[in-house]
Amino acid sequence: MAKLDFDALNSTIRYLMFSVFAVAPGELGEDRADVIDEAATFLKQQEDKGVVVRGLYDVAGLRADADFMIWTHADNVEALQSTYSDFRRTTALGRISDPVWSSVALHRPAEFNKSHIPAFLAGEEPGNYICVYPFVRSYEWYLLPDEERRRMLSEHGMAARGYKDVRANTVPAFALGDYEWILAFEAPELHRIVDLMRDLRATDARRHTREETPFFTGPRISVENLIAKLP
């Protein structure tokens, strides 16, 4: 990979949207070829609007209330809102998909380590598996001395040093919804995310996490396979 221009990347405005849906059994019927073609065409067309579809993810069974998640990103939130609304209004899949959860985040430079760039923004390929969740820091966190927070974040980073295959996308979400941060881990194997998350529990920064649910986890999947598997 080419050397990253951290200044350029950190000056980039990039919004992310994670949208989770559920489908009622039987709504799609048995013949789904037209639904697949329409959905695939719709997602491809979003490129013309400046919207990147990073992936579709199968979350069925890992949650009882959801079937799939879409991750999109663009340089303005209106484009993401348009894709979200158009998907629900103009596609057969969208019309029978009930919203479960949707959150938006915006890339901003990391507070202490300007080289900490989200994987998607650094040009990395999407991972085979994803784990997305929001989190909210303790009330005390932002009032702690900079050096104390720097120390805890450094320790947190050191705990993850054995998981270089797990790529992080940690993105601020202040004022964009109910959370302060949205985090998406991508990895080639799901168990690597599980092991990393467990190890990160044993760090001081964990004491300053006030909220970190819901979790949406699953494999990246093609449009064809997703629609074929839906109930």
UniProtKB/Swiss-Prot annotation:
- Keyword set for this entry? Heme, Heme biosynthesis, Iron, Isopeptide bond, Metal-binding, Oxidoreductase, Ubl conjugation
Q: Specify the superkingdom.
A: Bacteria
Upper lineage is: Bacteria, Bacillati, Actinomycetota, Actinomycetes, Mycobacteriales
Q: Where are the transmembrane segments?
A: none
Q: What is this protein called?
A: Coproheme decarboxylase
Q: Which GO terms describe its biological process?
A: heme B biosynthetic process
| Chain residue numbers at which the record places covalent cross-link Isoglutamyl lysine isopeptide (Lys-Gln) (interchain with Q-Cter in protein Pup) | K44
- The protein's role, per its UniProt record: Involved in coproporphyrin-dependent heme b biosynthesis. Catalyzes the decarboxylation of Fe-coproporphyrin III (coproheme) to heme b (protoheme IX), the last step of the pathway. The reaction occurs in a stepwise manner with a three-propionate intermediate.
- What's this protein's family per the entry? Belongs to the ChdC family. Type 2 subfamily.
Q: How is the cofactor bound?
A: Fe-coproporphyrin III acts both as a substrate and a redox cofactor.
Which EC class is this protein assigned? oxidoreductase
Q: Which reaction does it catalyse?
A: Fe-coproporphyrin III + 2 H2O2 + 2 H(+) = heme b + 2 CO2 + 4 H2O; Fe-coproporphyrin III + H2O2 + H(+) = harderoheme III + CO2 + 2 H2O; harderoheme III + H2O2 + H(+) = heme b + CO2 + 2 H2O
Organism equals Mycolicibacterium smegmatis (strain ATCC 700084 / mc(2)155)
Which pathway is this protein engaged in? Answer: Porphyrin-containing compound metabolism; protoheme biosynthesis
Q: What is its EC number?
A: 1.3.98.5
For this protein, the record's SUPFAM superfamilies field holds: Dimeric alpha+beta barrel (SSF54909)
Q: Which Gene Ontology terms cover its molecular function?
A: heme binding; metal ion binding; oxidoreductase activity, acting on the CH-CH group of donors, oxygen as acceptor
Q: Which InterPro entries match?
A: ChdC/CLD, Dimeric_a/b-barrel
